[in-house]
């Protein structure tokens, strides 16, 4: 998960204070009272506007009945006018810029988005973009880069202080939008997309996107043929069995057309960008490989992979955007190798009083179905390591009560001691200090009948570090030497002939060879093991990385070797 640099200020406490449980609880009488709605949209300041907006969004995703939904939709159409009215009254609107609540209709976001996202914005919404020159900092870099597009700029930029770069750009672009003009110039370069991105991203240009209502959180919604109404209490964590969900019947899934996939990826990029965020799978999602799954209870999930040119060298990557009654409520990121997946589940702040545990369990069921994964790893940050929001929310116990365990023995002992205290005193609460200790390491979930999978100490980073040490030890720290040697060795050991392979398959070979070359006696594998390893390499660069994972799950020797290298 990556986040574009935000120029907003604020904290997660703002939203936590604004969400009134009575306003968000579907079972509350207040959610359908006429008086509650008739007085609802009279914001006197930005904070009260946020409170009203977030409660309305929650009601839209979790409506109690058709009447509530209709009233909610009507109130949301008034949000942009409320923002404008507060602005006209010179109210302080800076709270609306906080990342936790950004994306409200009538506002904008400013961030140093990546080249890929800015180029996409230019394609979709060129008239809504502008450079925020107040945040222009990389003058030297700009002066060194832009002469290729601005003739004679060197005469100013190379020797003068306080160069009026904005004047140069304004004179050159004519009537073209300044952001669009810059992107057009970069696209004209005879370079790969990655090389263009490296140069553009080094400029750290802050782009303001003044989005329309449909792109805002206020107005963003997928059309739904059928709404699921919550006329009964929401599903709580105590009602969810992760083991039961993982073993539940298959979830209905279908592959979208290219046009449908493009629409979903547009929504995914929008819902991230208005929150100052970027996700690799949304930015580089493959429109040809988008799947739609129906989880039930009005919940749709769209799962996407990435094209071969943007894949990770070793792990398979999948992202998912999750809708509740047409409203985007969460996203998921899975980084997988063999049967192990690193799970990143992010519920948007507004919806954290919803059916979080059930939703997470259903997503994991879907990942097991699509990818064959049975071991789920949680990064310490998700649990609260260097993440005070995770500490405040008790994220550790959320995962622990679903069946996850700390992988470090010392943290498992602390966990069991805390559990004994809670069993003896129902009013006992783990202190923030203890939660920070518990969050220091990874957590893992395995199905009960699987036993210890051997993945406890594994980290992909360790595999990469082992490659670096070998490069320093045997190849004088020369990356070209270790690559060429590894490729030649693996091609010979596995009897690979790659001359007819696709570019993606060859790229996969070039990356995986660095790891395979470190496996002892790989040349002595059986013919069947070598043939399967070759299929695994090709699948990494093939159409769908799910095939890569499922083939890896069949190769016991490769799996064991990877665990040793990464542990």
Tell me the role of every PLM-derived stretch.
Residues 249, 253-352, 361, 365-371, ...:
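A conserved beta-strand-loop-helix scaffold within acyl/acetyltransferase catalytic domains
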Residues 414-423, 435:
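Extended amphipathic alpha-helical segments with heptad-repeat/coiled-coil character used for oligomerization
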Residues 144-154, 158-190, 194-198, 330, ...:
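Acyl-donor binding region in acyl/amide transferases
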Residues 210-228, 304-314, 318-322, 357:
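Short secondary-structure boundary segments
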Residues 1-155, 160-164, 172, 176, ...:
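Long, compositionally biased intrinsically disordered regions
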């Amino acid at each position: 998960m990556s986040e574009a640099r935000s120029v907003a200020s604020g904290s997660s406490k703002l939203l936590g204070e604004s969400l009134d449980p009575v306003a968000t609880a579907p079972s509350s009488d207040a959610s359908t009272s006429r008086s509650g709605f008739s007085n609802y949209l009279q914001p006197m300041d930005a904070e009260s506007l946020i409170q009203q907006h977030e409660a309305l969004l929650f009601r839209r995703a979790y409506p109690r009945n058709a009447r509530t939904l209709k009233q909610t939709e009507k109130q949301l159409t008034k949000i942009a006018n409320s923002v404008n009215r507060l602005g006209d009254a010179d109210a302080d609107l800076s709270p609306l810029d906080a990342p936790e609540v950004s994306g409200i209709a009538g506002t904008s976001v400013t961030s140093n988005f990546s080249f890929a996202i800015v180029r996409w914005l230019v394609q979709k919404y060129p008239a809504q973009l502008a450079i925020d020159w107040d945040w222009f900092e990389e003058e030297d870099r700009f002066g060194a880069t832009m002469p290729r597009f601005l003739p004679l700029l060197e005469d100013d930029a190379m020797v003068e202080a306080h160069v009026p770069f904005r004047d140069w750009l304004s004179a050159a672009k004519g009537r073209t939008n300044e952001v669009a003009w810059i992107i057009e110039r970069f696209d004209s370069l005879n370079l790969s997309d990655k090389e263009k991105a490296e140069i553009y991203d080094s400029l750290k240009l802050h782009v303001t996107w003044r989005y329309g209502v449909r792109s805002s959180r206020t107005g963003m919604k997928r059309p739904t043929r059928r709404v699921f109404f919550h006329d009964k209490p929401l599903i709580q964590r105590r009602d969810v069995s992760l083991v039961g969900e993982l073993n539940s019947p298959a979830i209905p899934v279908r592959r979208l057309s290219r046009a449908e996939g493009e629409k979903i990826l547009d929504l995914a990029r929008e819902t991230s960008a208005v929150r100052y965020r970027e996700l690799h799978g949304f930015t580089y999602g493959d429109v040809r490989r988008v799947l739609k799954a129906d989880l039930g209870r009005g919940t749709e999930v769209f799962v996407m992979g990435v094209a071969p040119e943007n894949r990770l060298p070793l792990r398979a990557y999948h992202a998912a955007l999750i809708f509740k009654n047409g409203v985007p409520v969460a996203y998921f990121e899975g980084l997988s190798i063999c049967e192990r997946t690193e799970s990143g589940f992010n519920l948007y702040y507004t919806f954290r009083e919803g059916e979080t545990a059930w939703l997470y369990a259903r997503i994991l069921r879907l990942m097991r179905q699509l990818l064959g994964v049975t071991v789920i790893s949680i990064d310490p940050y998700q649990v609260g390591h260097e993440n005070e929001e995770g500490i405040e929310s008790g994220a550790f116990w959320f995962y622990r009560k679903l069946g996850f365990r700390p992988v470090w023995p010392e943290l498992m002992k602390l966990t069991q001691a805390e559990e004994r205290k809670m069993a003896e005193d129902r009013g006992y609460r783990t202190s923030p200090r203890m939660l920070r200790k518990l969050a220091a390491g990874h957590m893992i979930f395995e199905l009960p009948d699987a036993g210890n999978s051997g993945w406890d100490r594994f980290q992909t980073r360790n595999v990469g570090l082992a490659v670096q040490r070998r490069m320093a030890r045997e190849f004088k720290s020369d990356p070209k030497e270790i690559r060429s040697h590894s490729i030649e060795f693996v091609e010979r050991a596995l009897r690979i002939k790659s001359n007819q392979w696709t570019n993606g398959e060859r790229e996969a070979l070039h990356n995986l060879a660095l790891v395979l070359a470190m496996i002892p006696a790989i040349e002595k594998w059986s013919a069947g093991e070598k043939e399967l390893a070759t299929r695994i390499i090709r699948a990494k660069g093939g159409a769908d990385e799910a095939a890569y994972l499922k083939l890896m799950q069949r190769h016991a020797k490769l799996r064991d070797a990877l665990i040793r290298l990464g542990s």
